């Protein structure tokens, strides 16, 4: 995993997310993967950006999401690019669902547990404050834990 200062070619956000950092910097993240070792390397490489750092990624999927997640360092923008997506937030124990179609977006407030379900093939773009992101298996109807509880410090 490495941050690239200048990428002259097109970037596929599905395989190469872009880190938005302090000073309005945008750096492609080559070799990014959703495994603990790479996430740790990414977190270390962008630590100086703190809560102001953002990761821009496109996800393609089909069906329900596996996990609840929350981002205590900042809000997350979720944009539906294609298909239909339902974002479910846990608001004081009550599910709050937002259905998105192509071109529609929603903002998950900082610290709010949320999950994303795709009704058939769909794509989303996310802009995420990754510092301190927490994940919980989606084995129950809602996540456990409180908004202030600490968790793994990965994007």
Region locations from a protein language model:
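A short, N-terminal "cap"/entry segment at the start of jelly-roll beta-barrel domains
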Residues: 1-68, 144, 149-155
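Ligand-binding loop in jelly-roll beta-barrel domains
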Residues: 101, 110-135
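Short beta-strand segments in beta-sandwich/barrel cores
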Residues: 66, 83-89, 104-105
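Short histidine-centered beta-strand/loop micro-motifs
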Residues: 45-47, 65-72, 89-90, 97-98, ...
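Short, surface-exposed beta-edge/turn micro-motifs
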Residues: 53, 74-77, 122
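Short peripheral tails and domain-boundary helices/loops at the edges of structured domains
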Residues: 132-149
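Short, conserved beta-strand element in jelly-roll/cupin
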Residues: 72-87, 127
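Short acidic-glycine-tyrosine-enriched beta hairpin
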Residues: 92-110
């Amino acid at each position: 995993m490495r941050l690239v200062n200048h990428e002259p070619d097109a970037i596929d956000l599905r395989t190469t997310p872009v880190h938005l950092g302090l000073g309005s910097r945008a750096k492609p993240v080559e070799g990014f993967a959703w495994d603990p070792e790479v996430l740790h390397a990414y977190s270390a490489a962008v630590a100086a950006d703190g809560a102001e750092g953002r990761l821009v990624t496109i996800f393609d999927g089909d069906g329900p999401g596996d996990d609840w997640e929350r981002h205590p360092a900042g809000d997350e923008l979720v944009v539906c690019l294609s298909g239909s997506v339902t974002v479910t937030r846990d608001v004081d124990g009550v599910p709050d669902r937002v259905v998105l179609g192509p071109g529609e977006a929603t903002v998950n407030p900082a610290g709010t547990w949320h999950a994303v379900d795709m009704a058939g093939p769909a794509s989303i773009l996310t802009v995420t404050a990754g510092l301190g992101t927490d994940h919980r298996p989606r084995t129950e109807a809602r996540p456990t834990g409180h908004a202030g509880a600490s968790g793994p410090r990965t994007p």
